[in-house]
């Protein structure tokens, strides 16, 4: 079951099983200026590891994409750690493509590369 919090322009959804949250997706307007408008961004998506392959992640992402499609978004984007091969395979299986943008994000003394994925809706 998906619970929704569609306040303002940054809606989020929670996936539940048996009354317990097992994942979430948070979305909103794109933060990157080069994303064609109207567009949207998946800010975060997370599913508990024990729920991977349960369909929860797919349902969350599909719900978010449909929400923005209904609001005439043409492109959705998300950022993923370059080394996150499982996450990247998940997005690619759902039609997302690396769009050539990359950036470094800093966590204290560490710098981690991210790549951007896009989906035309």
Regions found by a protein language model. Give the residues of each.
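C-terminal "cap" of GNAT-fold acetyltransferases
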Residues: 12-13, 38-40, 74-77, 81-88, ...
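Active-site acidic-Proline motif in GNAT/NAT acetyltransferases
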Residues: 48-50, 54, 82-83
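Acetyl-CoA-dependent GNAT
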Residues: 1-50, 58-63, 67, 71, ...
């Amino acid at each position: 079951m998906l619970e929704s919090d569609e306040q303002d322009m940054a809606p989020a959804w929670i996936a539940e099983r048996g009354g317990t949250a097992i994942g979430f997706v948070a979305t909103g307007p794109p933060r990157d200026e080069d994303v064609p408008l109207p567009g949207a961004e998946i800010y975060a998506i997370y599913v508990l590891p024990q729920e991977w392959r349960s369909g929860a992640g797919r349902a969350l992402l599909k719900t978010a994409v449909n929400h923005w499609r209904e609001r005439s978004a043409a492109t959705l984007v998300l950022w993923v750690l370059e080394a996150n091969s499982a996450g990247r395979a998940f997005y690619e299986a759902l039609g997302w493509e690396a769009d050539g943008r990359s950036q470094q994000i800093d966590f204290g003394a560490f710098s981690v590369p991210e790549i951007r994925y896009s989906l035309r809706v």
